[in-house]
Amino acid sequence: MAETAYTPRLRTEYDRKIKSALTEKFGYANVMQVPRLDKVVLNMGIGEAVNDRKKAETAAADLSLIAGQKAVVTYSRVAIATFKLRENQPIGCKVTLRKAKMYEFIDRLINVALPRVRDFRGLNPKSFDGRGNYSLGIKEHIIFPEIDFDKAGESWGMDITVCTTATTDDEARALLTAFNFPFRQ
């Protein structure tokens, strides 16, 4: 028997509504010119991991819970004496999401995690890099429902980069606005 493959809600919405709306707005001649989400990179920089290796492993475990995919511990490449940092010491962790997991994460970020941020007034609309990618920072990783507030010993910040195939910031802004990213006015 053939089973139907699972398609994330945001991917279905992109295929049905967003793609045609962007084609109409920007007047693309080819369907492949329409910008789409490429990947989402989650990064946690753990400064305290220099003194305690367990903190990097704990952060990687938390990031794996948030992303639904195993996180990789990142190591320093050069020694910096002022930070008491030697080469190949753990300093953080990261994970790259693509395809279905990417759409699921963005759905949870927009609808569940960002509304839980204290004094949230919207995302900064100027955080595009000039090539159609958007980056945002979160001060506490405990805003995600996968992290139990009581069991989390510490709360770390994290960087989230949404990479798109858009060539300009305006195209990327239109794409992310169509995905209901809550930008400040």
From Swiss-Prot:
One Pfam family per UniProt: Ribosomal_L5
Any one GO molecular function term: rRNA binding
Record's keyword terms, sorted: Ribonucleoprotein, Ribosomal protein, RNA-binding, rRNA-binding, tRNA-binding
Record carries keyword Magnesium: no
Record's GO cellular component terms: ribonucleoprotein complex; ribosome
Keyword RNA-binding (UniProt): yes
Residue runs in coiled coils: none
Protein family (similarity comment): Belongs to the universal ribosomal protein uL5 family.
Family annotation (NCBIfam families): PRK00010.1
PANTHER family: 60S RIBOSOMAL PROTEIN L11-RELATED
Protein name: Large ribosomal subunit protein uL5
